[in-house]
């Protein structure tokens, strides 16, 4: 009885077999009559391996070099996939403009950086906030404080800091890494919080440097396996990346909170000097409950990112001048002709120094300090140039590849920006794209200009005779020269006295 019942349940009868066959035939005919959809046609990329795909074929450290090699094989669009993720690398300015600028509504989001964003807490900061209302609120605050008109009030601070840099280099030229770090950080601290400091060992400068090193390593896409497999964030606290994340969270919270609270206390005491934070807190005082946290994180983003890129760019410039004294001499001749040797450079001189501006552009092109910018993420499925780009694809602009897409790319040649057929101006890619364009662009450009122009005006930068200087750069999110030696000497006693005199006039 039981066996008979089992056979009746498990084995179809002849009529039921016929019904099933008819059903399958009907389905097959229906499928043949349906319009055929094309399979996903992803952009080209390295061969896909079982399970992991191609996503792990490039090390996060210095990935821009490998991306540029792959461009020669696969072209301007480079696609990786695996472990449930898709990554699209943009290797041309056209592709970047088409997607990040013209389709900014689709490509203005950020990927979820599980470690640095969620576990370390940096996801509250404007650079990593998802595209939406909260991000727009942060953006409005930053724009109001850093518009082209607003940053003019900080010209004096930036010029004072340039003079202070020169004075410190006169006293201790071999410590130029430390001096540039101090001055780049000091500009940001003074502008954002009204907090000038005296040494590079100051707790604000030193802590910002350590914190930005942590952020720089963690913000490179794929730096942690947890970024590719977010469920790993639930692993216990003793796992190494969890310990790193916990330390990073404490460092980031201190970075954004301590100077902010300093300004609040100074405002309560009536002793707060002018600053971005003071302005924003004063302007939004009637709505403080809603915006104080936003102001803290908006100004914290300025503090963390602003000094780092200025520091890196000036170090690249010093290296380039030590390697190319003939370019330095031509820039000095222009400064002597336009400004003379009776006064210190000013930001207002910028429009009258075309060759100096070309030197700055070439510095930015020769080694971009943000070689991969900061990754984006597609908000929906998209089609570009005949290729499918799935929703949630991480999109990386290969800035280093674009900067090197010109004749004699390894040569330092400012003249290329003064001739016909000049490369794309680095300012069009150095500060981001579309709706994610860095609001600190104008402040940053002014800082780089006045620091570089002051160094050209006052000093001769030459190689160290005991060391063969070879360009060598770090491989993190922000890339700058590894420690190197060079000689930084005043052009004359008169130039040295000019720097000392101007530094004595500073307002702090």
Swiss-Prot record:
Domain of life: Eukaryota
Membrane-spanning residues: 14-34
Keyword Secreted tagged: no
Required cofactor names: heme
EC number, as in UniProt: 1.-.-.-
Compartments where located: Membrane
Family annotation (InterPro entries): Cyt_P450, Cyt_P450_CS, Cyt_P450_E_grp-I, Cyt_P450_sf, Cytochrome_P450_fung
Positions annotated to bind heme: 438
One GO location term (cellular component): membrane
Recorded GO MF terms: heme binding; iron ion binding; monooxygenase activity; oxidoreductase activity, acting on paired donors, with incorporation or reduction of molecular oxygen
UniProt KW S-adenosyl-L-methionine keyword: no
Pfam families: p450
Membrane topology listed for this record: Single-pass membrane protein
Glycosylation, residue list: 464
Pathway(s): Secondary metabolite biosynthesis
Major subcellular location class: membrane
Keywords annotated in UniProt: Glycoprotein, Heme, Iron, Membrane, Metal-binding, Monooxygenase, Oxidoreductase, Transmembrane, Transmembrane helix
Protein family according to the UniProt entry: Belongs to the cytochrome P450 family.
Main function: Cytochrome P450 monooxygenase that is able to use 3,5-dimethoxy-trans-stilbene and 3,5,4'-trimethoxy-trans-stilbene as substrates for oxidation.
Name used for this protein in its record: Cytochrome P450 monooxygenase 74
Source organism: Postia placenta (strain ATCC 44394 / Madison 698-R) (Brown rot fungus)
């Amino acid at each position: 009885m039981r066996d008979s019942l089992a056979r009746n349940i498990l084995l179809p009868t002849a009529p039921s077999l016929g019904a099933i066959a008819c059903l399958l035939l009907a389905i097959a005919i229906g499928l043949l009559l349906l319009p055929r959809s094309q399979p996903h046609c992803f952009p080209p990329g390295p061969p896909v391996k079982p399970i992991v795909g191609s996503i792990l074929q490039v090390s996060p450290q210095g990935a821009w070099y490998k991306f540029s090699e792959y461009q020669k094989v696969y072209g301007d669009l480079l696609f990786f996939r695996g472990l449930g993720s898709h990554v699209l690398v943009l290797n041309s300015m056209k592709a970047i403009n088409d997607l990040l600028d013209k389709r900014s509504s689709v490509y203005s989001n950020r990927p979820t950086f599980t470690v640095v964003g969620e576990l370390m807490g940096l996801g509250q900061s404007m650079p990593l906030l998802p595209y939406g209302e909260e991000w727009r609120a942060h953006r409005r605050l930053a724009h109001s404080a850093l518009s082209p008109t607003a940053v003019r009030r900080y010209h004096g601070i930036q010029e004072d800091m340039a003079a202070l840099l020169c004075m410190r280099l006169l006293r201790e030229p071999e410590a130029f890494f430390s001096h540039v770090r101090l001055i780049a950080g000091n500009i940001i601290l003074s502008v954002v919080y009204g907090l000038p400091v005296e040494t590079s060992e100051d707790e604000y400068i030193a802590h910002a440097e350590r914190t930005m090193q942590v952020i720089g390593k963690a913000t490179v896409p794929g730096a942690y396996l947890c970024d590719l497999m977010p469920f790993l964030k639930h692993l216990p606290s003793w796992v190494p990346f969890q310990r790193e994340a916990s330390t990073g969270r404490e460092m980031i919270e201190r970075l954004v909170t301590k100077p902010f609270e300093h300004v609040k206390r100074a405002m309560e005491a009536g002793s707060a000097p002018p600053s971005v934070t003071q302005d924003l807190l004063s302007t939004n005082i009637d709505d403080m409950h809603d915006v104080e946290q936003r102001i803290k994180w908006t100004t914290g983003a300025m503090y963390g990112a602003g000094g780092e890129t200025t520091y890196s760019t000036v170090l690249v410039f010093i290296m380039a001048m030590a390697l190319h004294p003939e370019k330095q001499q031509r820039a000095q001749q222009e400064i002597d002709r336009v400004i003379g040797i009776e006064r210190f450079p000013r930001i207002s001189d910028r429009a009258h120094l075309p060759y100096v501006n070309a030197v700055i552009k070439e510095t930015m092109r020769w080694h971009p300090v943000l070689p991969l910018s900061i990754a984006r993420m597609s908000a929906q499925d998209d089609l570009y140039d005949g290729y499918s780009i799935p929703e949630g694809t991480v999109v990386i602009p290969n800035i280093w590849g674009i900067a090197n897409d010109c004749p004699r790319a390894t040569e330092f040649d400012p003249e290329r920006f003064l001739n016909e057929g000049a490369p794309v101006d680095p300012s069009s890619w150095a500060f981001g794209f579309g709706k994610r364009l860095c609001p600190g662009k104008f402040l940053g450009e002014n800082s780089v200009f006045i620091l570089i122009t002051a160094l050209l005006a006052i000093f001769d930068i030459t190689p160290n005779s005991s060391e063969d200087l070879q360009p060598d750069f770090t491989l993190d999110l922000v890339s700058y020269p590894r420690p190197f030696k060079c000689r930084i000497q005043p052009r004359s006693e008169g130039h040295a006295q000019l720097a000392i005199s101007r530094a004595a006039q500073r307002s702090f």
